[in-house]
Curated annotation (Swiss-Prot):
Record's signal peptide: 1-22
Name listed for the protein in its UniProt record: Proepiregulin
PANTHER family the UniProt entry points to: PROEPIREGULIN, TRANSFORMING GROWTH FACTOR ALPHA
Species the sequence originates in: Mus musculus
Purpose of the protein: Ligand of the EGF receptor/EGFR and ERBB4. Stimulates EGFR and ERBB4 tyrosine phosphorylation. Contributes to inflammation, wound healing, tissue repair, and oocyte maturation by regulating angiogenesis and vascular remodeling and by stimulating cell proliferation.
Length: 162
């Protein structure tokens, strides 16, 4: 099996991330190519005016931009002259200002009771349907066999009667 060159792999990974971005409508934050320092590296990003993926230089933002990202790290795309925020886990938004809170609440007693009742009713209705289908099928089968017997016995007798 032939292996793909590293540039093809990176291009395919980048295109996959942009396809994912289009599907879930999120902002793609450029990340460094594996093996490079995150302070000064190159990354593949899609330009707004150009549908192709381009390689850009990334550096940390200057010290006067320390407070730009509320919950994340500020990065500067040198070639595009734009700044982006690399958000911490759980934060989203252009400046990492939104906390994505996932709350797991225990189920209420009413919800559990309603679920149990609905499942119980579903099982009773299903059992009733199966029972009536079996009775209908049995009656139909016995009716057919009775008709066969009537057809056989209703004909003229084979032996003469004495």
């Amino acid at each position: 099996m032939e292996t793909l060159p590293a540039s093809w792999v990176l291009t395919l990974l980048c295109l996959g991330s942009h396809l994912l971005q289009a599907v879930i409508s999120t902002t793609v934050i450029p990340s460094c190519i594996p093996g490079e320092s995150e302070d000064n590296c190159t990354a593949l990003v899609q330009m707004e005016d150009d549908p192709r993926v381009a390689q850009v230089q990334i550096t940390k933002c200057s010290s006067d931009m320390d407070g730009y990202c509320l919950h994340g790290q500020c990065i500067y795309l040198v070639d595009m002259r734009e700044k982006f925020c690399r958000c911490e886990v759980g934060y989203t938004g252009l400046r990492c200002e939104h906390f994505f809170l996932t709350v797991h609440q225990p189920l209420s007693k009413e919800y559990v009771a309603l679920t149990v009742i609905l499942i119980f009713l579903f099982l009773i209705i299903t059992a009733g349907c199966i029972y009536y289908f079996c009775r209908w099928y049995k009656n139909r089968k016995s009716k057919k066999s009775r008709e066969e017997y009537e057809r056989v016995t209703s004909g003229d007798p084979v032996l003469p009667q004495v």
